């Protein structure tokens, strides 16, 4: 009788072990890899959603002044606090941390050419006009170009743009602080403004399918 009870206990233990193993195996198979999904989607431009925008200034750690986009398409970090050319409109490109930055006064987007030079462009749809925001441990933000990996927006002490191929994330020249324009109170700044993204054929087809 004692041998029979011992055998039943052993079989029950084996059965519970098998059930646990099966459950863990099913979970590992069915559980989606959200981290991989977020990484992949962050590399793509989101043309299905409306872009979120925010307005602020970018304070350069090295020049001690602010990034500005001038009417001649030049970009530098020589603007004083509250300068009309220092007011920047920042648009989200994906649900990640990629953004497009344009001057509120001129409408030119800050882009980077193949030589690593910062320039202003009227249209900013290319990847060379997209930057990934990287928040650093010192609370500054670095802006890495989406097309040219490892190339950062950076300025010298005189406010001149640095060649991007000479920049690194840890360098002071590539560090920025977001600031509201002078005269703007924190309570006056809306969390985000929504602007419609230009529709293409794929977007129109998606909207029609949603309505139907």
UniProtKB/Swiss-Prot annotation:
tRNA processing recorded as keyword: no
List of glycosylated residues: 139
Annotated family: Belongs to the heparin-binding growth factors family.
The keyword Metal-binding is annotated on this UniProt entry: no
Annotated signal peptide: 1-27
GO BP annotations, alphabetical order: dorsal/ventral pattern formation; fibroblast growth factor receptor signaling pathway; midbrain-hindbrain boundary development; neurogenesis; pattern specification process; positive regulation of cell division; positive regulation of cell population proliferation; positive regulation of MAPK cascade
Encoding gene (name): fgf8b
Organism: Danio rerio (Zebrafish)
Any GO MF annotation of the entry: type 1 fibroblast growth factor receptor binding
Described function: May act as signaling molecule during development of the midbrain-hindbrain boundary (MHB) organizer, and be involved in patterning of the nervous system.
Protein known as: Fibroblast growth factor 8b
Residues spanning the membrane: none
InterPro entries: Fibroblast_GF_fam (IPR002209), IL1/FGF (IPR008996)
A Pfam family this chain is assigned to: FGF
GO cellular component, one term: cytoplasm
Family annotation (PANTHER family): FIBROBLAST GROWTH FACTOR
Location of the protein in the cell: Secreted
Keywords linked to the UniProt accession: Developmental protein, Differentiation, Glycoprotein, Growth factor, Mitogen, Neurogenesis, Secreted, Signal
């Amino acid at each position: 009788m004692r041998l029979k009870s011992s055998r039943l206990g052993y079989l029950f233990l084996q059965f519970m072990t098998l059930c646990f193993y099966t459950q863990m195996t099913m979970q590992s198979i069915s559980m989606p890899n959200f981290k991989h999904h977020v990484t992949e989607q962050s590399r793509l431009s989101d043309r299905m959603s409306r872009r979120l925008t925010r307005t602020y200034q970018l304070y350069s750690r090295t020049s001690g002044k602010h990034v500005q986009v001038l009417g001649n398409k030049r970009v530098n970090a020589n603007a004083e606090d509250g300068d009309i050319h220092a007011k920047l409109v920042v648009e989200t490109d994906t649900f990640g941390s990629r953004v497009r930055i344009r001057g509120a006064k001129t409408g030119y987007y800050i882009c980077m050419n193949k030589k690593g030079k910062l320039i202003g462009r009227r249209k900013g749809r290319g990847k060379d006009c997209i930057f990934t925001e990287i928040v650093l441990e010192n609370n500054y933000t670095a802006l890495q170009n989406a097309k040219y990996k490892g190339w950062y927006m950076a300025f010298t002490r005189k406010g001149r743009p640095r060649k991007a191929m000479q920049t690194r994330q840890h360098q002071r020249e590539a560090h920025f602080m977001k600031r509201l324009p002078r005269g703007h109170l924190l309570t006056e700044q809306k969390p985000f403004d929504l602007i419609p993204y230009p529709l293409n054929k794929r977007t129109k087809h998606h909207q029609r399918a949603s309505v139907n």
